[in-house]
Amino acid sequence: ARMAPAALDLVTGLDEDTVDFVPNYDNQFMQPDVLPAAFPQLLVNGASGIAVGMATNIAPHNLSETIAGAIHLLDNPSASVADLMRYIPGPDLPEGGVIVGLDGIKEAYESGRGAFKTRAKVQIERVTARKMGIIVTQLPYMVGPEKVIEKIKENANAGRLKGISSVQNLTDRIHGLRLVIEVKNGFNPEAVLQQLYQRTPLEDSFSINAVALVGGQPRTLGLKEMLQVFLDHRLDVTTRRSRFRLKKYE
């Protein structure tokens, strides 16, 4: 139910000749070639997929920021990527985590290809009367707690991770994600945390390869190009809708 208004915004106008319809794969019925899409859904939702000879991987973005960026480009067609990043500073990752550095994001926004690092959101606090611990409350995008725990135990057993006495998953519906990594006495929690970033998915990398179909042809798109394709599409949708309504009332 929460997604219903946004879903309707993607299809509003289908009954007003705003887009072309084409046969489905077995010619059983007609389906829209594209959706009218009242917001830049490719950027907002992100995308990931593999086809013959190509692949795409686009991070999700904040809806309000993406719309603000599109409006700015509409008002300022010569806007640079740096200008647009004032409105769209980076991806909005639903699982949370912390994006480390902007260089990879800027490269991806300029060229359509790039990578950036994400880290878990953590805090160091006392977990027992005598021991300190590392509390994980958010994980990098697409990383689950089971994978993290598995890697911690695997590296600790192999001697590649030192200073960890236990790890517990205390996640629940009320408090959300909570991993408690207990640090052995005599070890610096900050040093242990740096080991965890190096050896486990508490630090991960996300690669952007923004390939999308434009006019039926695959193209690698930077941020400005992606927003411009959306604006051109909306101009076409609005023009077709206006013609449909005028013809209807003639």
Placement of each model-derived feature along the sequence:
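C-terminal interaction appendages of subunits in large macromolecular complexes
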Residues: 5-9, 14-17, 48, 54-250
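Cofactor-binding active-site loop characterized by glycine-rich and histidine/acidic residues
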Residues: 2
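P-loop NTPase nucleotide-binding/switch module
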Residues: 9-38
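Long insertion/accessory domains within large nucleic-acid-processing enzymes
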Residues: 28-44, 49-52, 57
